[in-house]
């Protein structure tokens, strides 16, 4: 589940679709997300994804909360960065494959190391996505 918009904003549709796909086709399900689904839905949604989602890929973007706010401009303001980290950490309890991503060339090598440290600390994998025009 990915595309234009945050998939967890239509959580009921996401869960129903994932359940149907799992039951009918037994295909792996991946969600690409900004990691703010629990803020969007005003509750911890991660346990609801257990058994429905095989991989969740969270856009980390940067290891720095201030830079994250500048880039993402979330309507949830300053609590967004910590909420995204907490969401991802919670995912490691319920979802088999948890990945956080940044895009190559958009941050420094030092920042990439800091992103790796965040992922190591919370139990997620770190992936640097290629920059594509």
Locate each region found by the language model.
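Hydrophobic anchor at the beta1->P-loop junction of P-loop NTPases
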Residues: 1
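Conserved AdoMet/S-adenosylmethionine-binding subsite of the radical SAM
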Residues: 4-133
